[in-house]
Amino acid sequence: DNSDVPENTHLVSKEVQAAFNAKYPQAKDVEWELKGDYAVADFYWDGGEHSAWFNPLSAAWYMTETDVRYENLPEPVLAAHKAGKYADWRVDDVDKLTREGMETLYVIEVEKGESELDLFYSSTGILVKTVVDTGHEEDYDDYLPQPDANGIIAIVKQKYPNATIVEIEREKGLQEVTILDENR
């Protein structure tokens, strides 16, 4: 059994490997790949399947995607989904997105007939975003924390001290920030 020997380590620096090993010391079946500007480790840890995203140069961790069983979702997320308008849709997959300095998101992929949706919930059960699922493999790279070149995070924290950032996206040359403040 070679599950303790990571695959494709030649793709990432020793610093990235060390940062990964410090964060997930018990990881098994680790396999590295480069996706865009990120070094991504797919692995098993703590009874589940995960993908962790790192900066290949600085070795900074950005995000971990974790496969989650529907019944293991936090109670507020389960309750919100069961009471929501997509409760009668079939649940296809559930992922947890843990991100550096940002709100943890739970993505419930649902389908009904030919329609497929990704439902993004905060850990408090707020449905923050609904996205049509295109059927392509989802990496959630749009939800990776972005460099804060314009000091946006500091501005948000100054104006909304109790807010958590859900998403920062660039649209038509402008940056749009989605926050949760007092569970709204």
Task: Give short role names for the model-derived ranges.
Residues 92-146, 150, 162-164, 171:
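A charged, solvent-exposed segment within the mature domains of Sec-exported extracytoplasmic proteins
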Residues 28-46, 90-109, 165-182:
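A cross-family detector of function-defining hotspots
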Residues 8-26, 70-92, 141-165:
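Short, non-transmembrane alpha-helical segments in secretory-pathway proteins
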